[in-house]
């Protein structure tokens, strides 16, 4: 079994994520593989920045949040060609985004961002990208 770990730049653009797919397919012909992916390039920083905006009571967090949703949706629209797979993925990703939005709203309301909450927020980057990659490959 081989573990393939891909960092943010490997899942940061359409070109790089399609390259990731080819690498995984080639390795899977030789042996079993486990794929580990980071958040889409730049998303971890965006998640943290959006956390800070919410903590400060700045409603700009909503704009930044929607920009993250749009980026993931555009990636899905571009790389997932099967209509059923794409719709199922949108449902799955949007459910995660609803959870994340609730966490941000809580941070915004109570003006508190514990380390545990921040870790939970950051985890959404990998959770979202792994769903996209799993559907792609």
Located regions from the model:
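Nucleotide/pyrophosphate-binding catalytic subdomain
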Residues: 1-136
């Amino acid at each position: 079994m081989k573990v393939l770990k891909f960092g943010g730049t490997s899942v940061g653009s359409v070109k790089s994520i399609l390259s990731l797919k080819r690498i995984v397919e080639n390795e899977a012909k030789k042996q079993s593989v486990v794929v580990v992916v980071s958040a889409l390039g730049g998303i971890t920083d965006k998640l943290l920045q959006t956390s800070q905006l919410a903590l400060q009571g700045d409603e700009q967090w909503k704009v930044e949040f929607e920009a993250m949703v749009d980026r993931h949706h555009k990636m899905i629209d571009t790389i997932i060609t099967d209509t059923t797979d794409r719709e199922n993925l949108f449902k799955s990703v949007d459910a995660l985004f609803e959870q994340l939005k609730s966490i941000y709203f809580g941070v915004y309301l109570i003006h508190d961002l514990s380390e545990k909450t921040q870790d939970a927020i950051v985890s959404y980057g990998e959770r979202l990208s792994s769903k996209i990659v799993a559907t792609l490959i």
